[in-house]
Amino acid sequence: MKEVKQLRTVTEARAITDLKAGRINGVHAWMLVDLALSTGLRVSEIAALQFKDVDLKRGYISVTRLKRKKKTKDTLAIGKDIIQHLKDYIASMELKRGPLFVGSRGPLTAQGLQRIWKRSIKLAGLPKELSIHSARHTIAVHLLKKTGNLRQVQKQLGHASPATTANMYADISFEDMQNGVNGLYDQQ
């Protein structure tokens, strides 16, 4: 199985902070990177987001997903930081309805968002193999580490089965393994 790259190092974290703050590659890149790293949505799910899918007062987004060949609507909680970024983005883009990501020629497609991601990664000096899917993997691993709740990660990512989530995202780093065995039987 091919290893999915994560955004790990301090340098990469700083570059991502720059991307999220809009200092690199403009308003679409800022929102795309922030949304990807804050929600774990697939690029196709981000491209499909509509203005009406975002509820900033209640702090959630509604996502249309394809599960077992059926479309479903999932509601995902979003954090305070992304809520503020969405407010700023919507105001700067003067959005009132329609797609959340719109370019000069109309709604941005998944491929268009991937091009924005790649250009942003390059401008930030990050490794080019960091795909937009890397953001999905990154949030999954961090959310699992923070909460220890596989079911929450499964729901966030929209997986039909917790086994899928566990097989793909329950990474254990060497550092985690060392921390786990060091002092295992020490008196507490």
Residue ranges and their predicted role:
Residues 1-188:
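Conserved catalytic core of the tyrosine transesterase superfamily
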